[in-house]
Amino acid sequence: MAANWLLLDGSSLMFRAFFGIPVGTFKAPDGQPVNAVRGFLDMLARLVSDRKPKALVVATDEDWRPAFRVKVIASYKTARLERGAMPAELQPQEPIIWAILNAIGVEVMGAAGFEAEDVIASLLPKITGTVEIVTGDRD
């Protein structure tokens, strides 16, 4: 049975799309890499086609290392501090992905100071029916 709701951790899927398709494989007419855009949209199309949800929400990280979490676990995502939060080639692709989702009517939600999984967790008590959560995160 298909889930009524499909909740996606958009930020983690965006990173997977970026690292899953080499930079330079797909470029916009101006030469800007769009590998993450292509990969994300391909994943989304496959998920919707396979799962056939009645509702879809894409949650985003508005803070990839929230202060409240670092206060509890000082080492939270410290490896990212050393290598940088987001690769330079991915940064301009993020707003393109969210804009495309908005343009096609997909709800994109984020909350200042929180990660996508926090947004997803806050939605669960408000949802009736079955839910499937899709994320690439392992934490």
Predicted region positions:
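Noncatalytic, basic helical substrate-engagement surface that gates or grips nucleic-acid strands
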Residues: A2-V134
